[in-house]
From Swiss-Prot:
UniProt biased composition (Pro residues): 236-245
Biological source species: Homo sapiens
GO terms assigned for molecular function: enzyme binding; lipid binding; molecular condensate scaffold activity; phospholipase binding; protein kinase binding; protein tyrosine kinase binding; SH2 domain binding; signaling adaptor activity
Keywords noted in UniProt: B-cell activation, Cell membrane, Cytoplasm, Membrane, Phosphoprotein, SH2 domain
Record protein name field: B-cell linker protein
Biased composition, class Acidic residues, residue ranges: 57-74, 173-187
Function: Functions as a central linker protein, downstream of the B-cell receptor (BCR), bridging the SYK kinase to a multitude of signaling pathways and regulating biological outcomes of B-cell function and development. Plays a role in the activation of ERK/EPHB2, MAP kinase p38 and JNK. Modulates AP1 activation. Important for the activation of NF-kappa-B and NFAT. Plays an important role in BCR-mediated PLCG1 and PLCG2 activation and Ca(2+) mobilization and is required for trafficking of the BCR to late endosomes.
Compositional bias annotation for Low complexity: 212-226, 251-260
InterPro entries referenced in this protein's UniProt entry, alphabetically: Immunoreceptor_sig_adapters (IPR051751), SH2 (IPR000980), SH2_dom_sf (IPR036860)
Mod. after translation: Following BCR activation, phosphorylated on tyrosine residues by SYK and LYN. When phosphorylated, serves as a scaffold to assemble downstream targets of antigen activation, including PLCG1, VAV1, GRB2 and NCK1. Phosphorylation of Tyr-84, Tyr-178 and Tyr-189 facilitates PLCG1 binding. Phosphorylation of Tyr-96 facilitates BTK binding. Phosphorylation of Tyr-72 facilitates VAV1 and NCK1 binding. Phosphorylation is required for both Ca(2+) and MAPK signaling pathways.
Main localisation: cytoplasm
Connected disease: Agammaglobulinemia 4, autosomal recessive: A primary immunodeficiency characterized by profoundly low or absent serum antibodies and low or absent circulating B-cells due to an early block of B-cell development. Affected individuals develop severe infections in the first years of life.
Phosphotyrosine: residues bearing it: 72, 84, 96, 178, 189
Amino acid sequence: MDKLNKITVPASQKLRQLQKMVHDIKNNEGGIMNKIKKLKVKAPPSVPRRDYASESPADEEEQWSDDFDSDYENPDEHSDSEMYVMPAEENADDSYEPPPVEQETRPVHPALPFARGEYIDNRSSQRHSPPFSKTLPSKPSWPSEKARLTSTLPALTALQKPQVPPKPKGLLEDEADYVVPVEDNDENYIHPTESSSPPPEKAPMVNRSTKPNSSTPASPPGTASGRNSGAWETKSPPPAAPSPLPRAGKKPTTPLKTTPVASQQNASSVCEEKPIPAERHRGSSHRQEAVQSPVFPPAQKQIHQKPIPLPRFTEGGNPTVDGPLPSFSSNSTISEQEAGVLCKPWYAGACDRKSAEEALHRSNKDGSFLIRKSSGHDSKQPYTLVVFFNKRVYNIPVRFIEATKQYALGRKKNGEEYFGSVAEIIRNHQHSPLVLIDSQNNTKDSTRLKYAVKVS
């Protein structure tokens, strides 16, 4: 029984504890549900209470109904009318009345006195009426001043015109127009015109004298000594007269006489060649250049003509037959010199394939070789390297690359070596082995170039 009591007592206590827990849970659940219900009821009106506190709670419930839009229209209209009506009435009277008054005072036209350069204090009393009446004469006042300036200018020109008449001695009357702007330069030009006035007078005299004197070349020392003296003076100061003698006068060998006699002989020599240019020498210096100019082209043509026949005749024999032969030989020698092949013991020249192979078979040594010209005479493949190895003869083409002016062995391939001359190819493969490919048997061999063979 004691055991049963011990077992039943805790069981009853546990039941009581469970009942309390259930009771507490129910109470708690009831409180939570009430709180949730309260939140659901109070949540919507909480917002309008803060924004619209003046309205009653009954109105707040109505605001969330279908008439919600109508409730917001009324406060907006009242607020707009109250906000914009008051400042418009008060500010309109204060802000917009003074500006028109200031604008009326501004058109007093204060700019007119400033345009004249006068001060406002001097014309303070005459602000309104006089400026309008005086602006009209101010406009014609400007042309009046210009007219005065123009009137002064002709007066100056009239004063300067008497200075001009001594100047036209130089036969230039148009310079009077240019004298007005620059006064100092005119005075500078007066002196040279007076000193230079005698030569223009002599110039027409020389032109007139040349015509009758052309028929009488012996008259200058006797009859018209004055006129001819002027002509000699014009020729003597410029030493350019003897300059054409070495150019056109290469044939005659008599320029070593005295100066007056040489000048006479020069004139006579020119007259003997062409009588017309003799008069031109006396008339103007520009015509002398025109006379000398045709003398030069034949001299230049002779220079070009001389080297052309020289190589043809020096060769001797028939020029037509012997001419082209040295041209081919010269071209071949130039190409051979560039390739570094000329006068080499391993160079066979224009040797055909059969004779080259026979010479190598006769040597019967591995590594024997020679260089011959290709049988096709192709500029891209000018030479052929012939090598003997293992009782076989290999003909390897030597290509010439025109773009870089270099040489290469065999067909074009990637990673091939380029050389500046054929001699460099031979020197390279005398130290490093050369790969020999047999296209028939698909075999590869290598050997160095050891023995140079000559074709007998």
